[in-house]
Amino acid sequence: MLPTLLIVTGARRIEGSSYEAEARVWWTARMLVLAPDVVIYGDASGPDAWGHEFATTRGIPWFRYTKRGTIERHDGAPVRWTDQPPPAHGDNRALWGAWLLHRDRIMVRHAAKRTDRYDVKLVGLMASTPGTGGTIATVNRATALGIPCDVEVF
């Protein structure tokens, strides 16, 4: 049996919402059942931050794909996930949205390349209200690459 590499994704609008507590209970239960050996996630609030907290409090190796173009690692200095610079601080929302979707595609692609060493899975939390579409795009990319996805909508 291969160790589990778990991609965490989710709508940041869940953080601070009226359904955050319910979403977090579901998410924590899924994390405990899936028992990841490695966790990877982005750097948004909400489920991404929960993934970091889950991994660090349990001593699980983690990799955080940041909007600055780096992968922060549990075991060393950050490395770049791209040679391109991120948009400037004041750039428009559409440019940043495209950049973050690109980041999420890279994150999923990196995980998919490790299926020879890991049982790669994804756990995702989606908000029932419209957002940027980043979570569903990440889930769709993972599904297209054959990664099983455990997703719930709140």
Task: Go through the PLM ranges and name each one.
Residues 2-154:
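Acidic/glycine-enriched connector segments
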